């Protein structure tokens, strides 16, 4: 577990970078039970003995089908060399990944009280405002992909709108250029791409009379989900997000290499 990996010097629990992801674990085609009575009625309401009372029906969005079993939520050390698992937890199959994160994270903290999470990497299924707020309260950097169904392309101010990647766009529809971050005021600075002399960009539309061009200041506190630190268009964000697949590889190792679904499951 996490403590053993710490003793071996494989992970650093004091500065832990977590990647989380859930995957389906099929245990049976239906709910398995045996009757405890001698009733002749097939659909009697007498008590039954269930071999897996904590399983239910879930939906596999990648294969577009329902299944019966568990949802395995895996938390891995994203900054480890071998995608080491920190804390896996079997939840009900019907549990969404955003809820699975909450259950697994707090269960992990109960077992690994010394774990200090500094950063967490998640896919778009976790693109929920409450998760960003929780991470901010606990000083955790949240690297989460945007979910377009949550609403991202919208008019934010009279002078600019927000594009699908969370970056401001000017009235001409051009993506503005990030020009720094003010830590004291907690806001990003964006400038006109035409005035900034970006390659391949030419615009005849004048958004500002200033020779400096249109400047937009975006406070991150206005919308933690859209305006992240680091910004989603930065190299830092992309490099960190690439580590997220460690949880997917760890799930594959559990399901395929160790044949988790082939075992006889009983809870």
Q: Each PLM stretch: what is its role?
A:
Residues 81-83, 166, 173, 200:
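Detector for glycine-centered tight turns/loop "hinges" at secondary-structure junctions
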Residues 189-230:
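Long, low-complexity, polar/charged, intrinsically disordered or flexibly structured peripheral segments
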Residues 1-120, 124-137, 147:
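Polybasic low-complexity intrinsically disordered regions
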Residues 11-13, 67, 185, 209-211, ...:
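A generic structural signal for short, non-catalytic loop/turn and secondary-structure boundary residues
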Residues 34-36, 41-43, 54, 157, ...:
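Mature extracytoplasmic/luminal segments of secretory-pathway proteins
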Residues 156-185, 220-266:
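Short amphipathic alpha-helical "interface-anchor" segments enriched in bulky aromatics
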Residues 98-194, 231:
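An internal, acidic/charged active-site-proximal segment
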């Amino acid at each position: 577990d996490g403590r053993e990996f710490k003793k071996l010097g494989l992970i650093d629990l004091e500065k832990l970078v977590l990647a989380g992801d859930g995957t389906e674990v099929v245990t049976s085609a239906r709910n398995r039970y045996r009757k405890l009575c001698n009733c002749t009625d097939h659909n009697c309401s007498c008590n039954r003995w269930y071999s897996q009372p904590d399983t239910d029906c879930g939906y596999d969005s990648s294969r577009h089908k329902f299944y019966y079993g568990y949802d395995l939520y895996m938390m891995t050390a994203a900054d480890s060399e071998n995608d080491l698992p920190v804390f896996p937890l079997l939840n009900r199959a019907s549990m969404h990944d955003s809820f699975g994160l909450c259950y697994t994270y707090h269960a992990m903290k109960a077992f690994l009280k010394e774990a200090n999470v500094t950063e967490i990497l998640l896919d778009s299924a976790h693109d929920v405002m409450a998760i960003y707020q929780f991470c901010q309260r606990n000083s955790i950097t949240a690297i989460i992909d945007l979910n377009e169904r949550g609403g991202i392309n919208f008019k934010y101010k009279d002078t600019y709108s927000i594009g699908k990647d969370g970056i401001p766009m000017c009235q001409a529809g051009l993506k503005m250029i990030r020009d720094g971050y003010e830590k004291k005021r907690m806001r990003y600075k964006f400038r006109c791409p035409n005035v900034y002399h970006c390659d391949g960009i030419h615009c005849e539309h004048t958004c500002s009379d200033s020779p400096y061009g249109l400047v937009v200041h975006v406070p991150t506190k206005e919308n933690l989900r859209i305006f992240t630190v680091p910004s989603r268009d930065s190299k830092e964000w992309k490099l960190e997000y690439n580590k997220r697949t460690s949880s997917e590889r760890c799930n594959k190792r559990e399901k395929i290499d160790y044949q988790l679904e082939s075992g006889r499951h009983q809870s």
